[in-house]
Amino acid sequence: MASLPCIPSNFKPGSPPRGLPLACKAFGAGASLAAQERWLMPWRDGGLGFSLLLVLAGTRTAEVEGISAAGATSAARRFTAVADAELLLKGPDRPRLCSLPPLPAGISPALISYVAARWIGVDPLVAAVGLTLSPPFPHLRLEVPGMGPAACLSTGEAMGLSRVHALWQRGFCLGRGLRRPLVLAECVPGGTTTAQAVLTGLGLQVADLISGSARQAPMILKQELVDRGLSKAALGFNPPPQRVIAALGDPFQPVAVGLLLGAREAGQPVMLGGGSQMVAVLALALAAMEPSHRQDMVDGIVLGTTSWLAEEAKRSDGRPGALECLIDCVGEFFGVRLLGLATGLRFNNSQHRALQDYELGYVKEGVGAGALALLAQLQGASCEQLLEACDQAMNQLLGTSYS
């Protein structure tokens, strides 16, 4: 993978306090203090650096009316990934070729990712696969042009098996070539539904554990699509993970699974930035491994997410929320202990309604926002500093004209 040069940041080398930063939370069966400390060690030193890869991908599942809030209409969602990536790369104060699609509420999580990436001093690398629109900025192309998005998962034939295999191998080669830790981020409208589909295809019962970009996830609609896809795919018992992806998945998944397996073979730790889509990737990787090797692999992996997603559907009596239940469900299914970490960033005191909407359950996560905010905290940023920077970025965004 290409080396990622640093850009100017507010990070000052030093020795951050041990343990998680203020307001950050660990969750999952692997959330022991010893496991947290072991995992955090390679990420605390800002001088070591890490690779940040954002994968953009497309699926026709996103065009189903009501399935996603990553764009107010199905037409708008075709361009969400490219617009989000351009915001991450260029920032809110420079003209961009792709306007952010209108959302029912909130603002793109790419704004949070941009702020955190600037603080850390990391320059993202963007990869694209299966998009309707080719990104108008330098990016890593993972397959020949013209392949297009995956078909809707309800067809039971989302992609050809040969395409899945090729993307898996492409990701594996990239991961195996890593020489430093990897933060993997994604932007895949409709991706929480394909995540639910592949997890179900692997044999897990997760229908009530999958979130999404909408304030109220369309659980009935999601399950209807999954049921139709499973019926047509006829996967049977214990299907191979590549077959599951081909039937029900999206192009991001085979790339990400390959990357994960390759990175761990190279001995590099990986932070999966997101929620259920990253949990699905981890489950697919575990399904491809011998049981005796699974815990060794996940010992170097953590899920990094936002507080809004980590606390979603958390019971008033303190019982775990949906995401924690999901990673524990996957961990129990494959006999491993998984660790999740959530940033402490909140927007209750933001100056902007679009950011305050996150506190109401809109958007929640995406483009690696939670993982990058967490890493910014690990390298010295306070929640107040990140909030102020996000407010400033919103001010810039509202004053930006588009070319």
Curated annotation (Swiss-Prot):
GO molecular function: nicotinate-nucleotide-dimethylbenzimidazole phosphoribosyltransferase activity
S-S bridge residues: none
CDD domains per record: DMB-PRT_CobT
Transmembrane segments: none
Family: Belongs to the UPF0284 family.
Designated name of the protein: UPF0284 protein PMT_1350
Taxonomic classification: Bacteria, Bacillati, Cyanobacteriota, Cyanophyceae, Synechococcales
